[in-house]
Amino acid sequence: MENIGIDLVEIKKIKKIGKDILAARILSSEEHQIYQIIQNPQSQLTFLAGRWASKEALFKAFQTPQKIDPTCQNYCNWSILNDKKGAPYVKNNTCTTFFNPILISITHTDNYALALVIVKKLPQSTS
């Protein structure tokens, strides 16, 4: 079964919430390390907006009739990282529900970040 999730985040909404408050709520430890390295405030906002949109889209894609492990539903247990070519990928070390593959695309403008996620839930092993 394949599911799709999409989310759009307005960057000025993050300004209202507060960058550091949102970072503490949604970023994994790996993402937080990347966030702290970013010096430009606008780049920090864009980074947060992309991660927030990605995780919202991911959770929307998880809304299936099957039971999802509660550890899969915590923002901080998921990392949206980038490979050597800059392409985003999804990482989770705590989720016991197995999804493969998880495909993700993130785009942004000066005002918005949008993420699209496609997940395929594999059947659980009967052994």
UniProtKB/Swiss-Prot annotation:
The main location class comes to: cytoplasm
Its catalytic activity?
A: apo-[ACP] + CoA = holo-[ACP] + adenosine 3',5'-bisphosphate + H(+)
Q: What InterPro entries does this protein map onto?
A: 4-PPantetheinyl_Trfase_dom, 4-PPantetheinyl_Trfase_dom_sf, ACPS, Ppantetheine-prot_Trfase_dom
Q: Where in the cell is it found?
A: Cytoplasm
Name the GO cellular-component terms: cytoplasm
GO BP terms: fatty acid biosynthetic process
Q: Which cofactor does it need?
A: Mg(2+)
Alphabetical UniProt keywords: Cytoplasm, Fatty acid biosynthesis, Fatty acid metabolism, Lipid biosynthesis, Lipid metabolism, Magnesium, Metal-binding, Transferase
What's the top EC group for this one?
transferase
Per UniProt, Mg(2+) binds at D7, E56
GO MF annotations in UniProt: holo-[acyl-carrier-protein] synthase activity; magnesium ion binding
**Domain of life where this protein originates:** Bacteria
> What's the Enzyme Commission number for this chain?
2.7.8.7
The record describes the protein's role as:
Transfers the 4'-phosphopantetheine moiety from coenzyme A to a Ser of acyl-carrier-protein.
Family classification: Belongs to the P-Pant transferase superfamily. AcpS family.
- Protein's UniProt name: Holo-[acyl-carrier-protein] synthase
Q: Which organism is it from?
A: Onion yellows phytoplasma (strain OY-M)
Q: Read off the lineage from the record.
A: Bacteria, Bacillati, Mycoplasmatota, Mollicutes, Acholeplasmatales
Gene name, please?
Answer: acpS
